[in-house]
From Swiss-Prot:
Pathway: Carbohydrate metabolism; pentose and glucuronate interconversion
Keywords, ordered alphabetically: Isomerase
Reaction catalyzed: D-glucuronate = D-fructuronate; aldehydo-D-galacturonate = keto-D-tagaturonate
Enzyme Commission number: 5.3.1.12
Gene Ontology molecular function terms on file: glucuronate isomerase activity
The protein, known as: Uronate isomerase
EC class of the enzyme, as a word: isomerase
Length: 466
């Protein structure tokens, strides 16, 4: 069987209307070569600290990417067959992906992976069962070369800044090694306190003990707990962090008085909290984190509304982040009011909101961000950082929030090699949307070109204080 060619059309994702497409091409030409600013993501800082060669195609492109393996699992492929939870021959795992690559037609994963195959590795045949070994061998051969090591790819991808995400319990040794190495690539961390502010996080009590040991603070008291959090925030800022990130089940906030907070902390610290008390503690700690952000200047991100680890059996067998997180309906208007009542009018706070509940875009999020000085909207996230998801986001938020209450794009990925592809998709979608506004005579083309640069580069640097 003849292998199908792999081509990337230069007009991919541009509007189908010919007149609009011509404008989109011109706008895209203004931003295609701009540096990548990636202010939020989950790549491994060890890669850039050690700069060791990546192992093989499967361990790099398949096993870390839950977008990919959740689709395979949905079609009955055991995770063990691709090397998750059990050792497997990397070539055999790659053949599994090739055998099922047709599942990704019409998905953003197909766009990203095809870009990686074509633009990073120079492949000119589509991944399929008959090309599995050819592509596997070609990728592995290239990964052994110096120009495919993490730092070389970072430079080749024209990345100006890349933020990873770490727990307060992380000693940040890899970030220290990056800074000490003399390499000029800018890789910074971000503060993700979920393991020590969410009573439902596995090992919460032990995590608090580790937090106390790391900081020398007495986390047996609420005052010592807050002091320990401040100490770790300061350590993260010293390591280059400009932001925090909070992955709570809901966007609930609360503003407890000191006595209430102390009693609630004692309850969750002791392990006897009810579900309602755990939610109240998370809610209160978001408000506390906002106050700390005003003090230390760290931008605050909230990523709520994911039902984590929905597949209990999969979580028991493989742990978290295995493709079983599901979007939920999320309230923002009532949930955020306690926090916004304290700090929403303070421009020193920069609070970036994300959602998996698209129904909230126009009804809640755009009106909130279009009013409160402290609020901005993050881009389409996770299940929605797709071409259609990005278009829906633009159409439902721009009229109320404008462009400058948004923060540009972030890729939020573990898949390092897909970062340029994800940013390219966002640039193409934004240029297509702006081209529509030009053709409809809502914007002049010079304004659209200026906005294209804002959405690609300037807004993200401003919002994340980079």
């Amino acid at each position: 069987m003849t292998a199908a060619p792999l081509r990337l059309h230069p007009d991919r994702l541009f509007p189908a209307d010919p007149d609009t497409r011509v404008v989109a091409r011109r706008l895209y030409a203004e931003v295609a070569g701009l540096p990548i600013v990636s202010p939020h993501g989950h790549t491994d800082p060890r890669w850039f600290a050690e700069d060791a060669p990546f192992g093989d195609a499967s361990s790099l492109l398949l096993q870390p990417d839950h977008y990919v393996f959740r689709m395979l699992y949905s079609q009955g492929v055991p995770l063990e067959a691709i090397g998750i939870g059990a050792p497997v021959d990397p070539r055999a795992a790659w053949r599994v992906l090739a055998d099922h690559y047709h599942l990704f037609r019409g998905t953003p994963s197909r766009l990203w992976l095809d870009w990686v195959f074509h633009s990073v590795f120079g492949l000119d045949v589509r991944l399929a069962p008959e090309t599995a070994d050819l592509t596997f061998d070609s990728i592995n051969e290239q990964l052994a070369r110096p120009e495919f090591r993490p730092r070389a790819l970072f430079d080749r991808f024209n990345i100006e800044l890349l933020a990873t995400t770490e727990s307060p319990l992380d000693p940040l040794d890899h970030h220290a090694a990056i800074r000490a190495s003399g390499w000029t690539g800018r890789v910074i961390t971000a503060f993700r306190p979920d393991p020590v502010v969410d009573p439902d996080f596995e090992g919460f009590a032990a995590n608090l003990d580790r937090l106390g040991a790391m900081t020398g603070e007495d986390v047996g008291s609420y005052a010592g707990y807050l002091a320990a959090l401040r100490a770790r925030r300061a350590a993260f800022a010293a390591a280059g962090a400009t932001s925090t990130d909070h992955g709570h089940p809901t966007a609930a906030t609360a503003d407890l008085d000191r006595g209430e907070a102390e009693r609630l902390y004692a309850q969750v610290r002791g392990g006897g909290a009810t579900a309602e008390q755990a939610e109240l503690f998370r809610a209160h700690m978001l408000t506390v984190m906002a106050e700390m952000s005003i003090d230390d200047g760290l931008v605050m991100q909230i990523h709520p509304g994911s039902f984590r680890n929905h597949n209990a059996d999969l979580f028991r067998r493989f742990g978290r982040d295995k493709g079983a997180d599901i979007p939920t309906r999320t309230d923002f208007v009532r949930a955020l009011r306690p926090l916004l009542g304290r700090f929403g009018n303070d421009p020193r706070l920069s609070l970036i909101l994300f959602t998996l509940d698209e129904s909230a875009y126009a009804r809640e999020l755009a009106p909130l961000a279009g009013h409160y000085p402290a609020l901005k909207l993050g881009p389409a996230w996770w299940f929605h950082d797709s071409p259609e998801g990005m278009r829906r986001f633009r159409r439902q938020t721009t009229e109320t929030a404008g462009f400058h209450n948004l923060v540009g794009f972030n890729d939020d990925t573990r898949a390092f090699l897909s970062i340029p592809a994800r940013h390219d998709v966002a640039r193409r979608i934004d240029c297509g949307y702006l081209a529509e506004l030009v053709v409809e005579h809502q914007l002049d083309e010079d304004e659209a070109a200026d906005l294209a640069v804002d959405l690609t580069y300037r807004l993200v640097k401003s919002a994340y204080r980079l």
